[in-house]
């Protein structure tokens, strides 16, 4: 092909853009996107609650290891908490989803995300629970032992209920943070709220209103959880004397 033909053809290819769909009005875009965003929000809540449940179980184990009279258990709990709190959650997600297959352990995106979030939030909740347990006056342990209660019975019937009142605000904050942290699992193709918004953006080429809409949904979810937190704190609060 002659050079005088190649040159304008190259310029045409260089500066041409792929056709884009016509922009919708923002109200129409948000109305059309609402069902998809709502579905993503539901999946986000389910994802966060599931991670919170598994994380709470692990946090209880870590907290008990942290207060046990065993240096090995104490050291294991401290090292775990240090690693989880001292490394970015995004890196932990990558290690579990992209790193474990090199060891022969392959996980689907959803289980990998739940494991990563559960393992991460457990470290923070375990410290909250451990601090709440240690915040109870030591004389209550001695009084319980004098009544014939075992260590487990004392923890369950005497120390645990009081420690729960202390730990509720911190545990609730962990759940609120977990709602926002679920957005990170979108990098491993888990279709939660942020991923749902990104999929709509890919077809509409209107990122700003959709990202703002996703942020608004996250904010609403967190506000609802804050309301539940305050209600729970009032229910667990000790009666005041007048």
Describe every region a protein language model picked out.
Residues 15-242:
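Transmembrane alpha-helices and adjacent helix-loop boundaries
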